[in-house]
């Protein structure tokens, strides 16, 4: 008989939300590390958790960083950050332009503007 069987295998990515949740959880538990030069010349440099007394190495599953990020809320000429003081924000937004996020907990002033323009309406 001339029958044939076909098998198809595929790999699916997990739900995008679950990937984001795992990354956020890892981000909230990051470890600061520092490079340590091995004492023996044949051994490579490795990373240890900073401020750990017993040269504890991070696990492969940990998210690590070498230097703390600058505070982008404040003006810092050395890092090229203009800060967020004086920037326009959206009080009702829940996105990156929200006042709660952009003002870094300092509070904000509200201003109301009226704009008048010709609309070239035809009746």
Curated annotation (Swiss-Prot):
Top-level taxon in the UniProt lineage: Eukaryota
Subcellular location: Secreted, Extracellular space, Extracellular matrix
Keyword Ribonucleoprotein: no
The entry's keywords: Developmental protein, Disulfide bond, Extracellular matrix, Glycoprotein, Lipoprotein, Secreted, Wnt signaling pathway
One of the Pfam families matching this protein, by short name: wnt
Disulphide-bonded residues: 89-104
Single GO cellular component term: extracellular region
GO biological process: Wnt signaling pathway
Protein name per Swiss-Prot or TrEMBL: Protein Wnt-7
Protein family per UniProt: Belongs to the Wnt family.
Known function: Ligand for members of the frizzled family of seven transmembrane receptors. Probable developmental protein. May be a signaling molecule which affects the development of discrete regions of tissues. Is likely to signal over only few cell diameters.
Single Gene Ontology MF annotation: signaling receptor binding
Maturation and modification: Palmitoleoylation is required for efficient binding to frizzled receptors. Depalmitoleoylation leads to Wnt signaling pathway inhibition.
Gene name of the record: WNT-7
Lipidation (O-palmitoleoyl serine): 1
InterPro entries found in the cross-reference section: Wnt, Wnt_C
Annotated glycosylation sites: 79, 90
């Amino acid at each position: 008989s001339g029958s044939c069987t076909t098998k198809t295998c595929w790999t699916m990515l997990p739900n995008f939300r679950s990937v984001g949740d795992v990354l956020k959880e890892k981000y909230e538990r990051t470890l600061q590390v520092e490079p340590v030069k091995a004492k023996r010349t044949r051994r490579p440099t490795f990373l240890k958790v900073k401020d750990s007394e017993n040269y504890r190495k991070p696990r492969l599953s940990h998210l690590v960083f070498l230097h703390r990020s600058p505070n982008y809320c404040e003006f810092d000429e050395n890092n090229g950050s203009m800060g967020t003081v004086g920037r326009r924000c959206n009080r009702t937004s829940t996105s990156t332009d929200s006042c709660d996020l952009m003002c870094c907990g300092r509070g904000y002033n509200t201003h109301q503007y009226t704009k008048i323009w010709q609309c070239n309406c035809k009746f």
